Structure formats: structure tokens, C-alpha cells
Amino acid sequence: MQQKIPIENLYYLLCYAWGVSDQLDKVKVDGEKCHSLENLLSMVLFNACDRLLRQGLLRAYRFEEQEVEGVRGKLNLAETLKSGKHLNGRTICQVDELTQDVVINRVIFSTLKRLMRIEGIDEDIRARLRKTLAKFPHIEEIRVTEGLLGRLLQHRLSGFYKLVLNICRLIWDSTLPCKDKDGRLEFLDFTEDDFRMNCIFERFLMNFCKQNCRDEYPEVHREYIDFQLSPFGMMFKETGEALPMMETDVTLFNPN
């Protein structure tokens, strides 16, 4: 029988796999309160969001068209004349507004809303999610896709935002609509997917070695080994037999 990875250990495994192990101490996880993956991810996300809200959500300028008194920004003369607003001293202008209602915060907000629909989350954790949602400023809920998350994670983000977005991505990847239950979602246990867990463990192993073994092994990388070109492979060359190419999970090398 396959042994389950302890919940707290899984959180450390994921943080190393995502390359954000330096953020581990910023979000505390109580293993005794997290007896399931959906509860674990919910707890990590609302604790992370509480931290983001305290330090201030990411803000950016967004191009908007607004009706204003006088002129501000770039005047849209055609729309102003067409609407007749100028007769009352008002205009329609295109302005840049500094706002927290930006894509990355929309993804986080929408993920919190998604968690509220997942069956199996404990009521005390659901209450914390509800409390965290109430703290958010006006942010639009959006449809989150794998493509959108992938593009956001390619940006230069702070380590903490990178952690939060990876949690969001895992939640969206692991939820499906429940059959015959309108609006409710089922959480899929990704630890039962051997291929997915192999990928996670490979990334964990690589990043763990890079961070903790550099002093003794300066070079940490993956390596392709072509047995056909090795002395052992040459023995089979004349027979026409092919040997496989192997890719290591991680190779540690000390040139000394």
C-alpha cells in the first residue's frame, strides 16, 4: 500500500519544487488542523493573503476612460461632443489610474472564491476564507486559465507572490465540478497521480540540492547519458543493438 506523505512535509516539498523555499517561514502551517490537501492549501492561501493585505496588495496603472470635471489625462473630444457633457463643464477623458484591481490580484481573489465552493473544507477554515475575502478591496472576479497563470509566473515576481500564484495554480489544476451538485467543486488528490508527483519530486530534488549542496558540489544540473557513446555501448555497436539514453533527476559534480 502506498504511504501518504505527511501534510506538513508536502508543503515543504511543494515550496522547494516551486523554487520558493525561502518563503517557507512567512506562511505557517498547522499540520494538526490540515488533515486534507484542500484544507492545507486553503490555510496556506488565506494566511498568505492576510500577509499581502497587511503589507499592501500590488498596484499598477490601468488605462481607463472616465467622465470627469474639466479635463484630466487625454481628452476624448469626439465622445465628449457626442455626449454633450461639455455643455455642463464635463468631459470624457482617458486617464491612468493607480489601482489594486490588476490581473494578479484578480487571480488570487478568484481563487479564494473558488475555494469556497470546494466540498470537504472544514467549516472553521471556510470561515477564515470568508473573513479574508471580506478584507479585499473592490477586485473583479475573473475566469482563471492555465495560460493566464503560466504567463503571470513568467514575470519577475517577488518570491512571496510567486508562492501565492503557484498555490493558486495548484488549486485550479486540482478542482472539477461535482456531478449533480450545482456550483460545487470536487478536489482531486494530486498525490495519487504518480506522473505528477514524480515531476514535483524531481523539481524538489533539483532545487534542494542547488540550495543545500553547493558548497560540496558546485555544479548541480540534469545530465543526459548516451550509452551508445560509452565504452559499454561500443560493445553492442557491431550487433546493431540500441541502448537507451538516460536523463538523471539530478547530477552533483565536484571538479576537484
Roles of regions detected by a PLM:
Residues 191-192, 197, 212, 221-223:
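Conserved adenosyl
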Residues 174-181, 206-221, 254-255:
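Secondary-structure boundary elements
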Residues 38, 161, 198, 202, ...:
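Active-site-proximal structural scaffolding
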